[in-house]
Amino acid sequence: MCNEVRRTVALGQVRDDFSFTRIPLHFPEGAPNLAPLESIRITDPNAIIRPSTTGEQGAELVTRRWSWPGPNGKPVFNMRSEGRDFGFSGTGGRCLVVADGFYEYTAPEDPKAKRKHKWLFTMRSEDWFCMAGLWRKTDVGEAFTLLTTAPGPDIEPYHNRQIVILSRDDWARWLDPGVPAADLAKPLPAGTLDVAQIC
């Protein structure tokens, strides 16, 4: 499961590229300082875009914690997308999670080696992307989780699940709770991702 992402894209580029959706983008808490981060892990804050919660037309970009405590105390940082619709309730809904890379780990070939191999996945044709997420109000404040689906051919050699990465054409559709999640939560086609070994 995905528990580490990269976000080095500048806020200005996010704002400019999001204009493609023709959805006004607001910053109700002020423009966040999106310092480039090579590693964002569970419980770290990251930028999300969600339908406006202040009554303004459009969407808003805020930073929120990744994961919330589950009933067993373990962090809910990924959630399976299959069989669910993920509409909006008064305490949460769909969001886009901003990143330009994510990491997966594989076991070393040598069974005596303790350190796993680390792989960085990036989009071949885009500088950054949005992952399908859910946000909600929790005991630790507002937080988000990432949705997962079956792996596409680029990820299958490394993991048996993949995060849901949305095409730019689907950003606005994901923020619309009337669009069925199953229409959007699909594996990526072959050749969408580049992969590089980090260690």
State the predicted function of each range.
Residues M1-C199:
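Short linear sequence motif anchored by a di-proline
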